[in-house]
Swiss-Prot record:
One Pfam family, short name: FAM70
PANTHER family reported for this sequence: TRANSMEMBRANE PROTEIN 255A, TRANSMEMBRANE PROTEIN 255B-LIKE
Taxonomy, superkingdom: Eukaryota
Membrane topology: Multi-pass membrane protein
CC per GO annotation: membrane
Species, as recorded: Xenopus laevis (African clawed frog)
Gene assigned in the entry: tmem255a
Transmembrane regions: 29-49, 56-76, 88-108, 200-220
Region (Disordered): 279-300
Record localization: Membrane
Protein name as it appears in the record: Transmembrane protein 255A
Family: Belongs to the TMEM255 family.
Biased composition (Polar residues): 279-297
UniProtKB keywords: Membrane, Transmembrane, Transmembrane helix
């Protein structure tokens, strides 16, 4: 159990670090995808507001381009392993410029929509739409205003104009726009007003969301997935038990260099057993000389057989039949 506790603790730490990395990556992908959606809306509505009329220019779509490119880099970098840090740093740089652009455009578009667009005469039905077959043709119209002299206004084709906002050749009341050229109807002016405020609100949302996204990507760019630790635990070797052990067999040299042993008694020796007198049952004799002479080999008995002995360095004689 003691040897398994460090490995279990290491596995738990690796699992925690891997889970934290995956959680950070999911958060990074979520905020960058959200920023990409917001930037797409900013670009779409900004382009719609810019192309709605000719004489009113809107720059609210620029932050959408910068924030969208930065969010795409963030999505790609969040799914990388090797070049993740470089890609996320580039994403943070673009998002930072997009945040600055969103702040500036939100102020400019908001101020422009609040101070230079007045829809009260349009809602009151005092604006007129002029359309001719010749687009470049200029027409003079007379604006009748109460308590003022009639004024002549030169307008182009496909123009929505409001005489209540025109001040007889001078700048309109508080710099308000009194004509909108290249529109299909006066209702396009209402759409332009709503689009401007929508782009302004989206730029404010993109401003704060870009700050949050840059912070999340900045905390995730230095994180790396933790590899599982390989723990090598040296276990004590167990004693080996040998079964069916064979006795040691002496080598061939032991038999070769040793003195030859005498063989046991042969059948011939047993036939002449009379040469060995039987011992008395009462015990051994007290006379050692007599006892020794009784075990001596008789002179008339044939000699015992013993194999010839040849030294190791001497060859045996050749065989003769």
């Amino acid at each position: 159990m003691l040897t398994q506790q460090p490995s279990q603790r290491t596995d738990i730490q690796a699992a925690d670090s891997t889970g934290s990395f995956n959680k950070r990556r999911r958060n990074s992908v979520f905020v960058t995808v959200t920023l990409l959606i917001v930037s797409s809306l900013i670009f779409t509505l900004g382009m719609a507001a810019t192309t709605r009329t000719e004489n009113v220019t809107v720059g609210g779509y620029y932050p959408g381009v910068i924030l969208g490119f930065g969010s795409i880099l963030g999505i790609i970098g969040s799914n990388l392993i090797e070049n993740k840090r470089q890609m996320l740093v580039a994403s943070i740089v673009f998002i930072s410029f997009g945040v600055i652009a969103a702040f500036c455009c939100a102020i400019v578009d908001g101020v422009f929509a609040a101070r230079h667009l007045d829809l009260r005469p349009l809602y009151a039905g005092k604006c007129r739409y002029h359309s001719t077959t010749h687009n470049d043709h200029t027409t003079e119209v007379t604006c009748q205003q109460p308590m003022r002299n009639p004024c002549v206004l030169k307008i182009r084709s496909n123009t929505c104009y409001c005489c209540d906002l025109y001040n007889c050749g001078r700048i309109g009341n508080s710099g308000l726009y009194y004509e909108y050229t290249d529109v299909k109807s006066c209702q396009d002016v209402v759409h332009l007003y709503h689009l401007l405020w929508s782009v302004t609100i989206l730029n404010i949302v993109g401003l704060f969301l870009g700050i949050i996204t840059a912070a999340v990507l900045g905390g995730f760019k230095d994180m790396n997935p933790a590899l599982p630790a390989i723990s090598c635990i040296a276990e004590t070797p167990r004693p080996t038990v040998q079964y069916n052990t064979r006795p040691a067999v002496p080598s061939y040299n032991t038999y070769y260099h040793s003195t030859p042993h005498l063989p046991p008694y042969t059948a011939y020796d047993l036939q002449h057993s009379s040469v060995f007198p039987a011992s008395t049952p009462s015990g051994l004799s007290d006379d050692p000389n007599g006892q020794a002479s009784s075990f001596m080999w008789p002179s008339n008995a044939p000699p015992r057989y013993s194999p010839p002995y040849f030294p190791p360095d001497e060859k045996p004689p050749p065989y003769t039949p």
